[in-house]
């Protein structure tokens, strides 16, 4: 109230009449009429300010508060959605890692199985080649033994013919050859 100054304008007619008529009464109570008029003016100004400035200002503040609360709620909702998206992406990433690990394990297992199959096939081929070679060697051995028997028989006949220096008949000659071949067949080769 110290900042309020007294206006040089004359008091309003209603106040003037109240001052003149009841001015003595008010003054007898120890009140100054000017002070009462200033209080009345302040109340009127307060009511006008409330109607004109305070309510729009408060409405603006309320709208601003609602806007801020809405922004905070939207930010919290966005944060929740971002958190859900992050969790989903994290789960997808983990699932992808597990699938990649599983694929690598399967590929390694398949490669090991193929390597084992190749080794087994090579062993089987080596065994087949070995068996074939052994069979061929056995056939060659048998053929060589048969040729050797034939040559031994022929040589035996020639040697026997020269030793005996006589001509044997065919039956005796065959018996001698067969006996010699049989004895030669029992020899270790």
UniProtKB/Swiss-Prot annotation:
Annotated GO MF terms: proton-transporting ATP synthase activity, rotational mechanism; proton-transporting ATPase activity, rotational mechanism
Main location: membrane
GO CC, alphabetical: plasma membrane; proton-transporting ATP synthase complex
Membrane topology, record value: Single-pass membrane protein
Transmembrane segments: 35-54
Superkingdom, natural source: Bacteria
Keyword Transport: yes
Subcellular location: Cell membrane
Keywords in alphabetical order: ATP synthesis, Cell membrane, CF(0), Hydrogen ion transport, Ion transport, Membrane, Transmembrane, Transmembrane helix, Transport
Chain's role: F(1)F(0) ATP synthase produces ATP from ADP in the presence of a proton or sodium gradient. F-type ATPases consist of two structural domains, F(1) containing the extramembraneous catalytic core and F(0) containing the membrane proton channel, linked together by a central stalk and a peripheral stalk. During catalysis, ATP synthesis in the catalytic domain of F(1) is coupled via a rotary mechanism of the central stalk subunits to proton translocation.
UniProt cross-references to NCBIfam families, sorted A to Z: ATP_synt_b
Assembly and binders: F-type ATPases have 2 components, F(1) - the catalytic core - and F(0) - the membrane proton channel. F(1) has five subunits: alpha(3), beta(3), gamma(1), delta(1), epsilon(1). F(0) has three main subunits: a(1), b(2) and c(10-14). The alpha and beta chains form an alternating ring which encloses part of the gamma chain. F(1) is attached to F(0) by a central stalk formed by the gamma and epsilon chains, while a peripheral stalk is formed by the delta and b chains.
Family per similarity comment: Belongs to the ATPase B chain family.
Protein known as: ATP synthase subunit b
Gene: atpF
